[in-house]
A protein has these predicted regions:
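N-terminal (or domain-start) structured segment
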Residues: 26-115, 151, 160, 164, ...
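Glycine-rich beta-alpha junction loops
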Residues: 98, 159, 205-208, 224-228, ...
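Short beta-strand->loop
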Residues: 112-122, 178-182, 200, 211-247
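Extracellular/periplasmic bilobal clamshell ligand-binding domains
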Residues: 296-319
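Hinge/capping helix and adjacent helix->loop/strand transition within the periplasmic-binding protein
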Residues: 32, 81-90, 97, 104-189, ...
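Mature extracytoplasmic/periplasmic domains
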Residues: 273, 277, 282-303
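Bacterial N-terminal signal peptides that target proteins for export
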Residues: 1-12
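N-terminal signal peptide c-region/cleavage motif recognized by signal peptidases
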Residues: 20-22
Length: 319
């Protein structure tokens, strides 16, 4: 009897010890530098804001916050590599609707949305269609005239498994155009391609194209949004203004490995939220041209879930 009771007592003590250790690990996390991986090109909006955020990591985490880049296949390489991480990892990764709603439909990927937990949204961005001034296209009506010439149109986008690629293909398909999506390893490269005349059009972030449009190096055609884009540079109709439901707002959010303890997810959320609310960081974001849009993980998941149907409808058009 004593042996039986002793065994139970030992088991309970061991179990309580494991709970205590696990609880302590959650409380002490992070115990090493925290890294946020950007799965897209160096110099792009996501990379710039990630590097800016890293400057304020130490005061929030008590550990250095590092910015890293892993490139390839529009983000799929980094996201696939990230699935090797264990729950409670010190590495996080950026992603968005392109990573999870579009990529699995346009290419074979070795990861699932369920492999990740959204932590916090960093920014949201409207895409615009821009062109080289030589095309003389500056609106949907003039784009229709250009398409009517029957020429095969080349459109630069950040990869093929991206919101840019999907929206471009959807719009040009619905307009009856002959088109080809030309993928690049980043939004900057896609924009450079249209400015140089390597391609006819590019779909990119409105904020990224703004200075080039202002300088006359590129012409803005239409905003991929449900409302007009009007500011000190743009005065653009939306695709919805012309009857096309071919739009998605780009999101850039931070994710961590599924199975991570909620306490660690919460710690990341609060630390990153504090960084994003720092006035110095907000000024940097403004200088970059980023519209910070802080949302919790539940809101990020809800948005990505909502894009699944639209992505499924248009994904086969990316060619």
């Amino acid at each position: 009897m004593k042996t039986w009771k002793s065994a139970i007592k030992a088991s309970l003590i061991g179990l309580l010890g494991l709970v205590s250790i696990n609880s302590m690990a959650q409380t002490n996390w992070p115990t090493a530098p925290v890294t946020i991986i950007t799965p897209w090109a160096v110099g792009g909006l996501a990379d710039q804001i990630n590097r800016a955020m890293s400057e304020y990591g130490k005061e929030q985490y008590g550990q250095p916050l590092l910015a890293d880049n892993i490139l390839g296949s529009g983000g799929a390489v980094a996201l696939t590599e990230y699935t090797k991480e264990k729950p409670n990892t010190h590495k996080l990764i950026l992603g968005g609707e392109g990573s999870f709603a579009i990529a699995p439909l346009t290419m074979k990927v070795a990861y699932k949305f369920e492999d990740f937990v959204p932590v916090i949204n960093i920014y949201s961005s409207t895409f615009v269609l821009v062109t080289n001034p030589r095309t003389k296209v500056d609106s949907i009506p003039s784009l229709k005239e250009y398409i009517a010439k029957g020429k095969k149109i080349k459109i630069a986008t950040n990869g093929t498994n991206s919101s840019e690629a999907l929206q471009s293909a959807a719009l040009f398909n619905e307009m009856g155009a002959k088109y080809q999506i030309i993928p690049y390893d980043g939004a900057n490269e896609a924009l450079t391609a249209v400015i140089s005349g390597e391609v006819d059009f590019a779909t990119t972030h409105a904020s990224l194209a703004k200075e080039f449009v202002k300088a006359g190096n590129a012409k803005a055609v239409v905003a991929f949004d449900e409302k007009k884009l009007v500011d000190d540079v743009y005065n653009l109709d939306s695709v919805v203004d012309h009857g096309y439901d071919t739009w998605m707002i780009n999101t850039c959010a931070v994710f961590i490995r599924a199975g991570t303890d909620q306490a660690i997810i919460d710690k990341n959320y609060q630390s990153l939220k504090n960084i994003l609310e720092n006035p110095k960081l907000q000024q940097t974001a403004k200088n970059i041209g980023i519209r910070l849009d802080i949302k919790d993980g539940a809101a990020v998941k809800a948005y990505i879930d909502s894009t699944m149907d639209k992505a499924a409808k248009y994904s086969k058009l990316v060619k």
